[in-house]
Curated annotation (Swiss-Prot):
Ranges where the record places region Disordered: 1-69
Residue runs in coiled coils: 85-116
Superkingdom as given in the UniProt entry: Eukaryota
Topological domain ranges for the Cytoplasmic compartment: 1-148, 276-313
Annotated function: Probably involved in membrane trafficking.
Similarity field: Belongs to the SCAMP family.
Protein's UniProt name: Secretory carrier-associated membrane protein 4
GO biological process: protein transport
Originating species: Oryza sativa subsp. japonica
């Protein structure tokens, strides 16, 4: 840079080390691997980066035509004409009219059946496996619901007593009392539970619902039999029923000396039959007081007299 003033042109070609930095490198005599120019204080000499080696990657497969389309192939749905719409509208109106007619017919029949005293009894109890009809809250008058609920409790109490009786007799059979008493206990349960429902509970339910005097008489007849059975089972003397087939006080006393556990079971059965007897006596007392106080007794006598007169003629 010696001999050059500060006013000289740095891009002017000349001899020595004065080089135009923008001149073609091929016209210079420098080597291909080095830079043939110097750029002064603001230029740095850098080597050009070499090209990356060629890779042998297989090309990607072509994308399907609907790759970026989230919708499936469109389906051509023919639009209904106005004639088809009118036809369907007429069909719907005809079906609606038919349903309204059937609904009115069913309602008319239900009202006629209700006026005649006929009530459809759908099975609704127990809720998990309906086997009987029992809707005290909706069908029984409010002033009679308490008595009906207690009567239903006495029905459930009888079922519980007979089921516990099977357990106790099974324990006695295991201890050597023989299979005969077990079969008798099963027979008591199979006949007693549905018999109690059909012979006295359902007549009482219908009598409370419709206030029928004859149904009250049917209830009194078989409910007295029910009370007599409960009292007999609580005592359980060996007169009518065989041996220890009922969990009464007498079998409990005879078993407590030989097998304590079986004796305790029989004493529990004795207590359950006693409670069932007391509850049943309360129910029949309440029903009888209502029966006499509401005039159903005189009505039943009149109906019985009319029935006897019709039978005589």
């Amino acid at each position: 840079m010696a001999g050059r003033s500060r006013y000289d042109n740095p891009f002017e070609e000349g001899g020595g080390d004065e080089v135009n930095p923008f001149a073609d490198k091929a016209s210079k005599g420098g080597s291909a691997g080095q830079s043939s120019y110097s750029g002064g204080a603001f230029y740095t000499t850098q080597s050009r980066p070499s090209a990356p080696p060629a890779t042998h990657l297989s090309p990607l497969p072509p994308e399907p035509a609907d790759f970026y389309n989230d919708f499936s192939t469109p389906v051509d749905i023919p639009m209904d004409t106005s004639k088809d719409m009118k036809t369907r509208e007429k069909e719907l109106l005809a079906k609606e009219a038919e349903l309204n007619r059937r609904e009115k017919e069913i309602k008319r029949r239900e009202e006629a059946a209700a006026r005649a005293g006929i009530v459809l009894e759908d099975k609704n109890w127990p809720p998990f496996f309906p086997i009987i009809h029992n809707d005290i809250g909706n069908e029984i008058p409010v002033h009679l619901q308490r008595t009906q609920y207690v009567a239903f409790a006495s029905l459930l109490g009888l079922v519980l007593c007979l089921f516990w009786n099977i357990i106790c007799v099974t324990a006695a059979w295991i201890k050597g009392e023989g299979p005969k008493i077990w079969f008798l206990a099963v027979i008591y349960f199979i006949l007693g539970c549905p018999g109690a429902y059909y012979l006295w509970y359902r007549p009482l339910y219908r009598a409370m619902r419709n206030e029928s005097a004859l149904k009250f008489g049917w209830f009194f007849l078989f409910y007295l039999v029910h009370i007599a059975f409960c009292v007999y089972a609580a005592v359980s003397p060996s007169i009518l029923f065989v041996g220890k087939s009922l969990t009464g006080i007498f079998p409990a006393i005879s078993l407590i000396g030989n097998t304590v556990i079986v004796g305790v079971f029989y004493f529990l059965g004795f207590a359950m039959f006693c409670l069932e007897s007391l509850l049943s006596m309360w129910v029949i007392q309440r029903v009888y007081l209502y029966f006499r106080g509401s005039g159903k007794e005189a009505e039943m006598k009149r109906e019985a007299a009319r029935s006897a007169a019709r039978a005589a003629f």
